[in-house]
């Protein structure tokens, strides 16, 4: 081997070897235990970022480790290739989304290969290819036939100038991102999949996901939002109309002081006929952004309708208001308001000077003070007539029973979860396989006409989807009858909801999945991805698996056994103020910093000598210009160094702070390992290790080696604390560096240690380990080498170091035989001069002995 560690030379050679040998290509082997490790597939944005590198390095470490355990390991990769960014980029670059996307895929694929990830490239998929989305279209038609797909009108963001639908991210301060026109809410027909039909399964099966983060499961439980409550019907005063609301707090029912309805509610429309101001307010509500997050944070506004509902238990009139925070598509489109015991209702009532009536006592039995906020805790009822004195549960049931008995209430289980709207009024997505006949009948596209292919040779104007602007595309025939194709495309979450299953049989053309392959590999054993996908992608991912199970395509209930959510990658961010006071962000690679004695940045200047403000560490992003290009780091330090830093700098699920000094440290460690191997191999052949003739020092080093193997095995396999595994290997290498190399046995022990270290480092730094394994004359390639096994006998200690205390203060440390009795330890302790000094002339009243660790003598 050469003397210097030169990653730029060895990494390309090793990657070529893997490619030629098809090292990571796998097939189903029924007699072999399988392991399916999957990282969330990337969107082909053009370049990898450090978040990608972290995600895929974690997956690769786990995959390589499992291969070394002798398992048949599948680790595939592909491209989540549809989506809105491609449309914007196509307009900007005067091209079409398809060529832009395919060019990005080619570039990013090369980047992934440079990082040495062990993918089975024969299984690569791109979700924008017809051979992929045809089966998604086929499956959608089957769901339609089962009654799990339906069409209904739903609100979207509409730009009246461009006559187009806008995604939430295209609405900026209530205006169209392109033409700055005020955006409206518009109801248009859209396709939905009945995820609510699976709400109970999705909720209950969370309990079976023992190896998923509790945080993700909690977020999904909250998103599904199962609640038990009562649907209550109010009469409307001086009218035949009825008004229904749903509540999970019937115990507060006697505190209702008003009812709020959505702008789209029939009562709102009825009242607006004779109230122009109300009609204007309803129109304003229609211009509210559709996203639920926006609804939660926007200013709450309302207007009285002049109508009143009759409280069904006390006969009082309560005003009916239109409120912008009530949505028609949620529940009944109306809510009962109890401002005494709901904070949103309290804020609204305070703003509009509406009555606030307390009906729940504080825990100490006192009446609540509602002057500053609502009292939202549960407690005993008062101000509630016949229900006074009841606690929450008794009050809930008594009022619910009374409402049911009067025929104006019905106990119901409700869900916060809403059916999945899969229609997108965009071009760059999979066409929805539905069509409309001349008589208006809507039918699924016949199987022999699938896939409905998205035309790729299009001109983007940045406004209208080419599918909608070209009326010829929609024209087709069914059984000789003219028909029009659906011009909406699927939500891109559709593609990412089942890709993991298609990886098991990407070339299969007889159906959506090859049952034999799918049921060999599934479920995924380890899934890796960001916590930001907890409720959207990971919910649809679980839902689709259950749909495929019920269609007979898979046999398991859940798609992934174990989930690891890696933390974000942070980097320093710097800016200066522009002429208009705006922040202009400067890349950290263009900034020179000065630090104080504690390493804190105290001064920063950019390449032009301009003082810049240090804004702290934040997530790497384009907006703050603080992303670090992985390719530059690989060219500078090598892929192995970047991978090692990524796994060592922080626990996998925590945020990682990018520090180039840390990258340099990882590089120095690999150089040190290389140098130790170079010096060792330079001394010629090694004799066999004879463990029966080892000296105490040699036994100690070998004990440390096998303890390290045991720890690293547990850290990678069970605990997934990869950073502590690397730290243990580093500590072992420090001990090896201090060990003598004179005798044959010294060198034989060094050989055993280095061969084990190379295998333990291999999942993290595969290129350098491949090369070192050959230099150390390991058997075969390290790619097929078994994981090292800790020798239990080697870990047994002949002696123990025991701390001796007198009255709780340390007075000495003694070495005793590992199997020494308490009596023998006491005798040995008494021989220590300092211990003997404190025992002279006193009586030992009590002895506390922790075997092999501590002896405390209590004297008086």
Swiss-Prot record:
One biological process term in Gene Ontology: leucyl-tRNA aminoacylation
Main location: cytoplasm
Keywords: Aminoacyl-tRNA synthetase, ATP-binding, Cytoplasm, Ligase, Nucleotide-binding, Protein biosynthesis
Protein name per Swiss-Prot or TrEMBL: Leucine--tRNA ligase
Single Gene Ontology MF annotation: ATP binding
Record organism: Pectobacterium atrosepticum (strain SCRI 1043 / ATCC BAA-672) (Erwinia carotovora subsp. atroseptica)
Position of sequence motif 'KMSKS' region: 619-623
Superkingdom to which the source organism belongs: Bacteria
Binding site for ATP: 622
HAMAP family, per database record: Leu_tRNA_synth_B
CDD domains: Anticodon_Ia_Leu_BEm, LeuRS_core
Top-level EC class: ligase
Chain ranges passing through the membrane: none
Motif ('HIGH' region): 42-52
Pfam families membership: Anticodon_1, tRNA-synt_1, tRNA-synt_1_2, tRNA-synt_1g
InterPro entries: aa-tRNA-synth_I_CS, aa-tRNA-synth_Ia, Leu-tRNA-ligase, Leu_tRNA-synth_edit, M/V/L/I-tRNA-synth_anticd-bd, Methionyl/Leucyl_tRNA_Synth, Rossmann-like_a/b/a_fold, tRNAsynth_Ia_anticodon-bd
């Amino acid at each position: 081997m050469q003397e210097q560690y030169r990653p730029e030379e060895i990494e390309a050679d090793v990657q070529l070897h893997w490619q030629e040998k098809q090292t990571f290509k796998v097939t189903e082997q029924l007699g072999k235990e399988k392991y399916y490790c999957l990282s969330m597939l990337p969107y082909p944005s053009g370049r990898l970022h450090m978040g990608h590198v972290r995600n895929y390095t974690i997956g690769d470490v786990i995959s390589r480790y499992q291969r070394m355990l002798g398992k048949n390991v599948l680790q595939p990769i592909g491209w989540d290739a549809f989506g809105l960014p491609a449309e914007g980029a196509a307009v900007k670059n005067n091209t079409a989304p398809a060529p832009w996307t395919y060019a990005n895929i080619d570039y990013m694929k090369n980047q992934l290969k440079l990082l040495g990830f062990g993918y089975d490239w024969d299984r690569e998929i791109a979700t924008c290819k017809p051979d992929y989305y045809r089966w998604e279209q086929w499956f959608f038609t089957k769901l339609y036939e089962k009654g799990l797909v339906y069409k209904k009108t739903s609100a979207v963001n509409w730009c009246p100038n461009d006559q187009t639908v806008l995604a939430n991210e295209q609405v900026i301060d209530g205006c169209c991102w392109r033409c700055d026109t005020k955006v409206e809410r518009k109801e248009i027909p859209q396709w939905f999949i009945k995820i609510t039909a699976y709400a109970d399964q999705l909720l209950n099966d969370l309990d079976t996901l023992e190896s998923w983060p509790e945080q993700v499961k909690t977020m999904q439980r909250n998103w599904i939002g199962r609640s038990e409550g009562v649907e209550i019907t109010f009469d409307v005063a001086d009218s035949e109309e009825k008004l229904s609301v749903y509540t999970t707090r019937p115990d507060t029912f006697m505190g209702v002081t008003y009812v709020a309805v959505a702008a789209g509610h029939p009562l709102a429309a009825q009242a607006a006929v004779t109230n122009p101001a109300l009609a204007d307010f309803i129109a304003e509500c229609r211009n509210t952004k559709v996203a639920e997050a926006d609804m939660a944070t926007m200013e709450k506004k309302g207007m009285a309708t002049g109508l009143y509902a009759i409280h069904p238990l006390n006969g009082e009139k309560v005003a009916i208001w239109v409120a912008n925070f009530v949505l028609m598509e949620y529940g009944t489109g109306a809510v009962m308001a109890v401002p005494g015991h709901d904070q949103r209702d309290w804020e609204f009532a305070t703003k509009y000077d509406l009555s606030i009536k307390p009906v729940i006592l504080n825990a100490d039995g006192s009446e609540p003070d509602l002057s500053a906020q609502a009292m939202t805790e549960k407690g005993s009822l008062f101000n509630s007539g016949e229900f006074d004195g009841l606690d929450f549960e008794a009050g809930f049931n008594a009022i619910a029973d009374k409402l049911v008995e009067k025929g104006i209430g019905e106990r119901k289980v409700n869900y916060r979860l809403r059916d999945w709207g899969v229609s997108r009024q965009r071009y760059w997505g999979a066409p929805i396989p539905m069509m409309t006949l001349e008589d208006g009948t809507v039918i699924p596209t016949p199987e022999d006409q699938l896939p409905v292919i998205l035309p790729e040779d299009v001109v983007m104007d940045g406004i209208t989807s080419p599918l909608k602007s070209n009326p010829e595309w929609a024209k087709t025939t069914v059984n000789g009858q003219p028909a029009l194709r659906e011009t909406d495309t699927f939500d891109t979450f559709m593609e990412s909801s089942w890709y993991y299953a298609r990886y098991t049989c990407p070339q299969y053309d007889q159906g959506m999945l090859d049952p034999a392959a799918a049921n060999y590999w599934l479920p995924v054993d380890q899934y890796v991805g960001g916590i930001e996908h907890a409720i959207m992608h990971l919910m649809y991912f679980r839902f689709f698996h259950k749909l495929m199970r019920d269609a007979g395509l898979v046999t398991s209930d859940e798609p992934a056994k174990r989930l690891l959510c890696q933390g974000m990658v942070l980097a320093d961010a710097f800016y200066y103020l522009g002429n208009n006071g705006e922040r202009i962000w400067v890349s950290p690679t263009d900034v020179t910093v000065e630090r104080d004695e504690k390493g804190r940045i105290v001064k920063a200047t950019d390449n032009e000598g301009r003082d810049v403000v240090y804004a702290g560490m934040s997530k790497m992003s384009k907006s703050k210009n603080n992303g670090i290009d992985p390719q530059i780091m690989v060219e500078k330090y090598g892929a192995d160094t970047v991978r090692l830093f990524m796994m060592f700098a922080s626990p996998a699920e925590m945020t990682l702070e990018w520090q180039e000094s840390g990258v340099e440290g990882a590089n120095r460690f690999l150089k040190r390992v290389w140098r130790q191997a170079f010096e060792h191999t330079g001394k010629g052949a090694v004799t066999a290790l004879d463990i029966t003739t080892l000296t105490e020092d040699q036994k100690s080093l070998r004990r440390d080696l096998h303890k390290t193997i045991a720890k690293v095995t547990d850290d990678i396999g069970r605990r997934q604390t990869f950073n502590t595994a690397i730290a243990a290997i580093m500590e072992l290498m420090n001990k090896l560096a201090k060990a003598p190399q004179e005798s044959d046995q010294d060198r034989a022990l060094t050989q055993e240690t280095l061969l084990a270290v190379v295998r333990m480092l291999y999942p993290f730094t595969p290129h350098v380990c491949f090369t070192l394994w050959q230099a150390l004359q390991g058997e075969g390639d390290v790619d097929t080498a078994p994981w090292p096994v800790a020798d239990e006998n080697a870990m047994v200690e002949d002696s123990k170091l025991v701390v001796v205390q007198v009255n709780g203060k340390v007075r000495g440390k003694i070495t005793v035989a590992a199997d020494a009795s308490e009596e023998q330890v006491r005798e040995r302790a008494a021989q220590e001069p300092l211990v003997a000094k404190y025992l002279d002339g006193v009586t030992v009243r009590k002895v506390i002995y922790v075997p092999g660790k501590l002896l405390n003598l209590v004297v008086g």
